[in-house]
């Protein structure tokens, strides 16, 4: 019995897709958690945001100088954030993801965008998320976010070198 070349092609393609699916690993899972955080943030729901954090998760948020170290405080932060930045969205930039067994760190930058008084505004910020594996989920145990600082000013030029004063002439020898 002769098999169709289409069956062979289909087999090769499906095997390749299965290999790609199997290749997804912890780094991709952590990247997906970052995207999930951004999607949930855009929903402006403090309860859902808080659920992404571990019970002992810590948040140093962009909009507050206060560290939040329990679920009630994390939720209060997002209640205030969603009032301050109505209908805010976040777009992730470059991410550096490192996975150490059941712990992962995602460091990078993101930009918050929102509209207030008819004007679209943005806040570029840098972040670090630390995750711990909890069953099949990654939970945030530490999240630091701070507004991106303004670029440093160029250093002032060094003062121009001045010539040293001429040495006084040596006294004439006595005669």
Predicted regions and their residues:
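Positively charged n-region of N-terminal signal peptides that target proteins for export
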Residues: 1-5
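Bacterial N-terminal signal peptides
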Residues: 7-18
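Short, low-complexity N-terminal intrinsically disordered segments enriched in polar/charged residues
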Residues: 18-55, 72, 151-175
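A short, structured loop/turn motif at beta-sheet edges
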Residues: 97-104, 119, 131-137
